């Protein structure tokens, strides 16, 4: 059973928690995150039978998401996020999901604004790794999705260390992209990235802290970008939309729907 686990915390801008400017534009593009989460679950179900995949939402203790079709969403409630900003909340929630959540099988931890464009089972069955992390242009981690194939003592230690790396950064530098930079700092430390050298990232399988870490390209047969990005792989399993790129979201959704319908 594959577990798709997006993180979503509904932001109350009157809660007194400081956020970077980027977060203040959270809902300025597209249809809104409730819509994206509903479509994300819908596209997952196109490609996976009920016994193959399950959809959860990792969140704080109060956020609710209403389904516009199908059953209620299964919420994974993470304590202690009320006084945390969005990126810190996401990082803490991801750590909890990978290390403690009561779910079995591979975990695909993601954001909200995604489209599933294929069945993950064959790739997971045929690919040897413990954790998969995307690298954009072999330079920067993009955690549109982080995949944990199996939970072990080593993977728990890895994600705890990643959380330590997050808190080693100054609050201002981790408030936006800190969730991604914490992975990058591990890559710098392990020699998978070289500071000041673009394109230095090493794709493929690496051993870090006893874990088989698979570095995959952001833009490829697993994780494709949006339709007007530098890459567009029609058969990629998963698509990511960020910021003003959401204006092309419905085009990508229609393409994914057509591809799925053509397989029926």
Predicted feature locations:
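N-terminal anchoring/stem segment of glycosyltransferases
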Residues: 1-85, 99-104, 153, 262-264
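A structural signal for well-ordered alpha-helical segments within the folded catalytic domains
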Residues: 38-41, 88, 92, 177-185
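Short, hydrophobic beta-strand segments that form beta-sheet elements in well-ordered domains
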Residues: 52-61, 106-108, 113, 131-132, ...
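Short, polar loop motifs at secondary-structure junctions
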Residues: 58-65, 116-121, 219-222
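Short loop/helix-cap segments at secondary-structure boundaries that form the rim of catalytic
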Residues: 63-71, 122-127, 225-228
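GT-A fold catalytic core of metal-dependent nucleotide-sugar glycosyltransferases
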Residues: 75, 82, 86-140, 146-156
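A generic structural signal for well-ordered coil/turn residues at beta-strand boundaries
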Residues: 141-142, 230
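Catalytic core and acceptor-binding pocket of nucleotide-sugar-dependent glycosyltransferases
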Residues: 153-261
């Amino acid at each position: 059973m594959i577990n798709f686990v997006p993180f979503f915390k509904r932001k109350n801008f009157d809660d007194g928690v400081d956020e970077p400017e980027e977060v203040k534009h959270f809902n300025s593009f597209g249809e809104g995150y409730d819509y994206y989460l509903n479509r994300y679950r819908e596209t997952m179900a196109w490609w996976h039978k009920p016994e193959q995949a399950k959809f959860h939402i990792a969140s704080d203790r109060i956020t609710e998401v209403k389904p516009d079709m199908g059953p209620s969403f299964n919420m994974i409630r993470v304590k202690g996020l009320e006084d945390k900003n969005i990126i810190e909340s996401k990082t803490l929630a991801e750590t909890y999901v990978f290390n403690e959540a009561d779910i079995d099988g591979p975990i695909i931890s993601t954001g909200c604004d995604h489209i599933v464009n294929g069945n993950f089972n064959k790739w997971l069955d045929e690919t040897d790794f413990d954790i998969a992390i995307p690298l954009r242009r072999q330079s920067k981690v993009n955690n549109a999705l982080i995949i944990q194939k199996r939970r072990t003592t080593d993977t728990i230690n890895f994600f705890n260390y990643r959380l330590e790396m997050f808190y080693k950064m100054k609050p201002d530098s981790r408030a936006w992209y800190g969730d991604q930079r914490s992975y990058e700092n591990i890559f710098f430390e392990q020699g998978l990235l070289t500071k000041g050298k673009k394109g230095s990232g090493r794709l493929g399988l690496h051993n870090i802290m006893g874990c088989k870490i698979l570095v995959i390209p952001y833009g490829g047969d697993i994780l494709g970008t949006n339709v007007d990005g530098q890459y567009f792989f029609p058969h990629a399993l998963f698509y990511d939309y960020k910021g003003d790129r959401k204006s092309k979201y419905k085009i990508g959704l229609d393409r994914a729907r057509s591809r799925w319908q053509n397989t029926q």
